[in-house]
């Protein structure tokens, strides 16, 4: 079994990722369940410039699209709601979350594309919201200040009852700082999105095998992201499907590829 904890839909930021692409990819590559977030909730572009208001969507609009997708594919698709920290938490948003807690499995942050630090007051109000609904908090991490792994570590220590997932383990880094931080906080998880299998093994050695989750960013490189990257080279994820399972125990492999996610996000696979 495989649970992919990092899948997208959405048009913008140079990407066009459709519901059809997601269904195609999980069917073709034997993904049993995918956690999906809607990238259209990004408020800033790749240069961290504000996207014109007329081109943005509210987080409620983004969540509505994700909910529709998950409802049409219940049992295979769950939601990580991509929050816009600069927006208020409205009664409508609360109602949408409360009415869909069976498919909303986490709140998702992207400090880079929100141009907002994960430790900001704006972000904290959504961490409180996650705590209120007992939802894990998932966040992109990179090498800047706002999205640095240290910011997640700081929040994990401040909110010990909430579980946090450090996506990418510091994208663009050697992952060592992120892994060391995860070793210091039992409520801090990592994922494999663009993380080498060598770093995954280092994570297991330092943190154990209970807090690493399989994730991919699919279909960011097209509907065959699991097979090859945007240049046509063999995908990193082929290593996770093949070579990686040969260098860890069967129990560890199951934990990383689906069991840890099933427990953290309360996902029941039949």
Where are these regions (language model features)?
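An N-terminally biased module of ancient metal coordination in phosphate/nucleic-acid-related enzymes
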Residues: 1-61
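H/E-rich (His + Asp/Glu) clusters that bind or coordinate divalent metals
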Residues: 163, 170-270
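Active-site environment of divalent metal-dependent phosphoester hydrolases
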Residues: 10-12, 41-44, 85-89, 114, ...
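Active-site acidic short loop of glycosyltransferases
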Residues: 31, 75, 132, 161, ...
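Hydrophobic faces of well-ordered beta-strands that scaffold small-molecule active sites
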Residues: 3-7, 34-36, 77-81, 105-109, ...
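Distinct, well-ordered alpha-helical segments
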Residues: 89-98, 117-126, 145-159, 174-182, ...
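Active-site gating/metal-coordination segments in enzymes
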Residues: 49-138, 184, 188-189
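Active-site gating loops and adjacent loop-to-helix segments of metal-dependent hydrolytic enzymes
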Residues: 29-56, 101-104, 162, 218-222, ...
């Amino acid at each position: 079994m495989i649970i992919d904890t990092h899948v997208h839909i959405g048009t913008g930021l140079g990407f066009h990722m459709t519901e059809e692409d997601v269904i195609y990819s999980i069917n073709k590559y034997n993904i049993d369940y995918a956690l999906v977030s809607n990238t259209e909730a990004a408020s800033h572009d790749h240069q961290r410039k504000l996207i014109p208001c007329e081109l943005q969507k509210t987080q409620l609009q983004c969540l509505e699209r994700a909910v529709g997708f998950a409802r049409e594919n219940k049992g295979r698709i769950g939601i990580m709601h991509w929050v816009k920290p600069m927006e208020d938490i409205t009664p409508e948003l609360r109602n949408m979350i409360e009415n869909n807690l069976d498919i909303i499995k986490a709140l998702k942050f992207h400090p880079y594309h929100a141009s907002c630090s994960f430790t900001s007051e704006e972000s904290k109000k959504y961490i409180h919201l996650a705590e209120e609904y007992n939802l894990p908090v998932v966040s992109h991490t990179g090498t800047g200040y706002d999205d640095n792994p240290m910011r997640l570590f700081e929040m994990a220590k401040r909110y010990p009852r909430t579980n946090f997932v450090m996506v990418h383990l510091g994208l663009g880094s050697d992952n060592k700082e992120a892994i060391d931080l995860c070793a210091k906080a039992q409520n801090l998880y990592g994922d494999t999105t663009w993380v080498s299998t060598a770093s995954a093994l280092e994570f297991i050695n330092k943190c154990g095998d209970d807090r690493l989750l399989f994730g991919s960013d699919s279909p960011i490189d097209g509907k065959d992201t699991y097979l090859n990257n945007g240049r046509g080279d063999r995908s990193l994820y082929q290593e996770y499907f093949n070579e990686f399972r040969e260098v860890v125990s069967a129990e560890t492999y199951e934990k990383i590829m689906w069991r840890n996610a099933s427990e953290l996000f309360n996902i029941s696979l039949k």
